[in-house]
């Protein structure tokens, strides 16, 4: 294929599809993805996905986890912050083309990223509400987004569960009671399914359940091997050591380019304005400085930052913890 016919697939949010189309992007109905032909074009830079990682790109810890998972064993991964746990899952999915894989993420942000980086056609990537919606639709049932999982559980005897060889759970620490019940349904319909659960109890974001997650995940996996990720690619050695001391776990920082800089709100706004919206995740109080910065970005750059921009915030009750 000549350079002029090289195809470049893009990661275009639904809210920005008209903009991409106006710049010359085309729609691939089979992949359900926007693309363009030719040499790399700066017009599409903000939608250009990051390169897909290969097995050889991973650390020794990450490669050992994939090697263990490929033996067919259940695996529990205790991964420190910034250790590339989600990236490792994505590479694993690309490494097992012979398996029918269900990869469950906790939120939409992770789902979008995973769909872009997993090229294998044998992998279903979705969040929990998306999986419930898919199953309900096949059973000719419907529910509002907030009732999807409850409706799934109420009608579980009517639902014909798809068959899977491998269940991958990302961010298992955030599993809630209803999600735990959904996972049990998946396992019941696939009694010999292999399970790989990846997470870090120290990074638990959602804490609105009485479910004892460590007890549940131990029972759910049954017989399993444990792998630990200790290398943090996000922090330098000093910061990682401090955080590890606070959390009481080993974290080895390997990113010596990492630095912490104190900025005022105007400086933060100017800095974020230069970043890709897909690279930004905001955590903080809805009534705090985070919201003020986001409002400033929307006022100053409405075409780039608007209500469709993906970000996460903790509840106001948790903001002081």
How would you describe each model-predicted region?
Residues 1-55:
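Accessory DNA-engaging acidic/polar modules
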Residues 23, 120-121, 222:
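Short, structured coil segments at secondary-structure junctions
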Residues 24, 30, 75-76, 165:
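Active-site-proximal or metal-binding-adjacent scaffold patches in catalytic folds
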Residues 24-26, 123, 299-302:
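Short aromatic/hydrophobic-glycine micro-motifs
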Residues 50-74:
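Conserved pre-motif I regulatory segment
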Residues 58-60, 74-100, 105-112, 129-131, ...:
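Conserved helicase motor core of SF1/SF2 NTP-dependent helicases
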Residues 69, 151-165, 186-190:
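Short basic/glycine-enriched coil/helix segment immediately N-terminal to the Walker B
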Residues 105-108, 112-113, 117-152:
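Inter-Walker segment of RecA-like/P-loop motor cores
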């Amino acid at each position: 294929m000549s350079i002029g016919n090289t195809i470049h697939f893009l990661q275009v949010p639904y809210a920005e599809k008209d903009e991409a189309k106006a710049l010359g992007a085309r729609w691939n109905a089979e992949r359900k993805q926007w693309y363009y032909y030719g040499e790399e074009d700066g017009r599409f830079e903000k939608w250009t996905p990051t390169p897909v990682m290969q097995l050889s790109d991973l650390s020794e810890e990450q490669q050992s986890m994939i090697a263990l998972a490929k033996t067919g064993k259940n695996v529990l991964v205790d991964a420190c912050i910034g250790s590339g746990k989600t990236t490792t899952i994505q590479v694993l999915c690309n490494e097992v083309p012979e398996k029918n894989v269900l990869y469950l993420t906790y939120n939409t942000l992770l789902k979008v990223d995973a769909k872009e980086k997993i090229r294998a056609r044998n992998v279903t990537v979705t969040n929990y509400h998306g999986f419930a919606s898919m199953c309900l639709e096949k059973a000719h049932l419907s529910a509002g987004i907030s009732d999807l999982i409850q409706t799934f559980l109420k009608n579980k005897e009517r639902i014909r569960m798809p068959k899977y060889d491998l269940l991958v759970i990302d961010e298992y620490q955030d599993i809630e009671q209803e999600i735990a019940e959904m996972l049990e349904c998946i396992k019941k319909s696939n009694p010999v399914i292999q399970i790989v659960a990846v997470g870090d109890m120290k990074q638990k974001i959602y804490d609105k359940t009485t479910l004892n997650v460590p007890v549940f995940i131990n029972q759910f996996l049954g017989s399993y091997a444990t792998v630990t990720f200790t290398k943090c690619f996000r922090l330098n050695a000093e910061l990682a050591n401090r955080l590890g001391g606070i959390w009481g776990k080993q974290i080895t920082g390997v990113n010596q380019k990492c630095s912490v800089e104190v900025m005022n709100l105007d400086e933060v706004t100017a800095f974020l304005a230069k970043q890709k919206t897909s690279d930004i995740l905001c955590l903080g109080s809805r009534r705090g400085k985070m919201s003020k910065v986001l409002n400033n970005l929307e006022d100053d750059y409405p075409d780039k930052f608007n209500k469709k921009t993906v970000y996460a915030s903790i509840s106001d009750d948790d903001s002081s913890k």
